[in-house]
A protein has these predicted regions:
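N-terminal FAD cofactor-binding segment of flavoenzymes
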Residues: 1-30
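Hydrophobic "anchor" residues on beta-strands that sit immediately upstream
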Residues: 12, 101, 105, 239, ...
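A short, glycine/Asx- and small/polar-enriched loop/turn
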Residues: 23, 30-31, 82-89, 234-236
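Helix-loop-beta segment of a Rossmann-like dinucleotide-binding subdomain
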Residues: 33-52, 89, 179-183
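Tryptophan-centric aromatic hotspots in well-structured domains and transmembrane helices
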Residues: 50, 106, 136, 163-165, ...
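Predominantly flavin-linked oxidoreductase catalytic cores and closely associated redox partners
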Residues: 64-208
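FAD/FMN-dependent oxidoreductases across multiple families
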Residues: 186-270, 275-286, 291
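C-terminal helical "tail/cap" subdomain of flavin- and related membrane-associated enzymes
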Residues: 268-363
Length: 363
């Protein structure tokens, strides 16, 4: 995603915010640690990115767009779109009820969970991933230094199919959230969302002391059954980008990668279209984006099934293989020179079997 931000002219503006730099990811399970550093990855590319409060990050991008001369409207709802061939008229309404219309030769729908075009034109399609729930907040992380690497993003395996994200920000706050099957959260004690999340945090040995009595910046929020797809990624006069196409899961930051790369790819094709050039949207857009989506999907499924647990926490790991998997975690899911991208649907399963067979022989 850093290449996309760089090409769009956002890098300097984001740097000025002083966001926490991210050099990899740390996975923890029952006290055992697996570390991935992006500098060790198989695919040539960026060795770092950022850990960001999304509100501040998104506002930085929007402000930079305005500086570039792009108008941005806030608190405005799209209520309808009419297409005439590839031309369109979009009706919008602000918070005061004022309506206006926007004429366009082409629409790029990057509305995220809003899913404007899919909802207006009945294009939503269920994901093939099971429904899951995320329960999270931001905390004032006063005891962060209890961790030996206090500024590292950490993913904790709480139990099979249930994991925790810990994302420290440069402002001293930390995002922390539990993710898993909705039934897991029904057994949580507490009569309020805050009590429920505090109970969950207290049940995780890796976080219990660090998060005890910390201040919650906002009442814990829920995202549920968030995995969703669409019947098509493009049509006459429009293209869908980011979460509007398909959102898989918060793990591995796949949403940010797919959002930035899909926007970058779509922008190039929209420019070609507006210049009168022929574009094969299926081949040049959908097939490319599905390569990334399907690679991430294989890793998301392997994560919840426990396959990645076996791989991440194995003894005597092969550095070359670890670097290939690291590239996927860094977002390079289009590099088919990487066997763990090219053969994503089978490579992880084969590796898991090899590790289990080796471990059985050494017992």
């Amino acid at each position: 995603c850093m290449e996309a931000l760089e090409e769009a002219g956002f890098i300097d503006a984001v740097k000025e915010n002083g966001f926490q730099e991210k050099f990899g990811a740390k996975f923890v399970k029952n006290g055992k640690i697996c570390d991935y550093f992006f500098a060790d990855q198989f695919t040539p590319g960026w060795s770092w990115t950022w850990q960001v409060p999304r509100g501040e990050f998104d506002k930085t991008l929007a402000d930079t767009c305005e500086i570039m001369g792009i108008p941005v409207s806030y608190e405005t709802t799209v209520t309808g779109i009419e297409f005439t061939g590839t031309d369109s008229v979009t009706t919008v309404e602000d918070n005061d009820g004022n309506k206006s219309q926007i004429e366009a030769r082409f629409i790029v729908d990057g509305s995220g969970y809003g899913r404007v075009i899919p909802r207006l034109f009945n294009m939503d399609k269920p994901s093939n991933l099971p429904p899951r729930k995320a329960f999270f907040t931001h905390v004032v992380d006063t005891k962060r230094t209890m961790d030996d690497e206090p500024n590292r993003i950490t993913i904790i395996v709480h139990q099979k199919g249930i994991w925790i994200w810990v994302i420290p920000f440069s402002n001293g706050n930390t995002s922390v959230g539990f993710v898993g099957e909705p039934t897991f959260f029904k057994s949580t004690a507490g009569s309020t969302p805050e009590e429920q999340l505090r109970d969950l945090l207290a049940s995780e040995p890796y976080l219990a002391e660090r998060t005890k009595d910390v201040e919650f910046i906002f009442e814990p929020r829920v995202l549920e059954s968030y995995s969703v797809s669409t019947t098509k990624f493009y049509g006459d006069g429009f293209v869908l980008t980011g979460n509007v196409t398909e959102f898989l899961d918060p793990v591995f930051s796949s949403g940010v990668t797919l959002a930035t790369v899909s926007s970058q790819t779509a922008a190039h094709l929209v420019i070609k279209t507006l210049q009168g050039e022929q574009v094969d949207w299926e081949k040049e857009y959908t097939e490319i984006m599905m390569q990334g989506v399907n690679t991430f999907r294989s890793y998301v499924m392997a994560w919840y099934e426990g396959t990645l647990d076996t791989i991440f926490f194995a003894d005597n790991q092969v550095p070359e293989i670890k670097s290939m998997i690291c590239s996927v975690l860094a977002g390079y899911v289009w590099d088919t020179n990487n066997p763990y991208v090219k053969d994503h649907s089978t490579a992880l399963i084969k590796l898991e079997k090899m590790i289990k067979a080796r471990d059985a022989l050494t017992k």
